[in-house]
């Protein structure tokens, strides 16, 4: 299992816990509002909005909240904020690269909170471009295994542009080019295979191995960054070995 997959497994488990928090709901709602504003309020004609709504539903966000966010974004209801996407770059403990994706209506607040979280947790900010080149934008679909085998999933999505299908233990992860994301999730739907989420993600091209102590420090930094309401996603290039994962699970 690659470092990507181990990190994804850890992130997935963490996401299940985070989903119980109102903060996670708020971030999903924000995604819906921005998607509707950018590409229109009809999910049938706006794949990004469709995927944002599906993920929110899978995470048990109430339908009323989802619909209100869609309407605010589409201009059908007042109250939408002027959200801006901002990327910050930096390095965490052990030289781990950190890419921070913010969605904010206050650039100064976002910058301040990100900088504070970084400096208080062994990280430091980096110049634009000095970290982002280590990451590549990818389309990522995750699904519960259920009765499906890896071959079942692979056969369903291979012709749709899927690059790889990875077994993450309790789930499968499908990686593609971002432009093939809609085709991949549509192929799953046509095959009658349910999925949890379909979204663009950043994947590291070069990874940094860390021991258990280093991993805990990186997780602490990521947690601190994600405490900010302005931070939507945090990506790192940390590589976790089987031994480190086992030690972390103890």
UniProtKB/Swiss-Prot annotation:
Signal peptide range in chain numbering: none
InterPro entries, alphabetized: Integrase-like_N, TACO1_YebC-like_2nd/3rd_dom, TACO1_YebC_N, Transcrip_reg_TACO1-like, Transcrip_reg_TACO1-like_dom3, YebC-like
Keyword entries, A-Z: Cytoplasm, DNA-binding, Transcription, Transcription regulation
Gene3D superfamilies: 1.10.10.200, 3.30.70.980
Domain of life, per lineage: Bacteria
GO (cellular component) term, any one: cytosol
Pfam (any one): Transcrip_reg
Gene Ontology MF, one: DNA binding
GO biological process, alphabetically ordered: regulation of DNA-templated transcription
Intracellular or extracellular location(s): Cytoplasm
SUPFAM superfamilies the record matches: YebC-like (SSF75625)
Chief subcellular location: cytoplasm
Family that this chain belongs to: Belongs to the TACO1 family.
UniProt protein name: Probable transcriptional regulatory protein ROP_68700
Species of provenance: Rhodococcus opacus (strain B4)
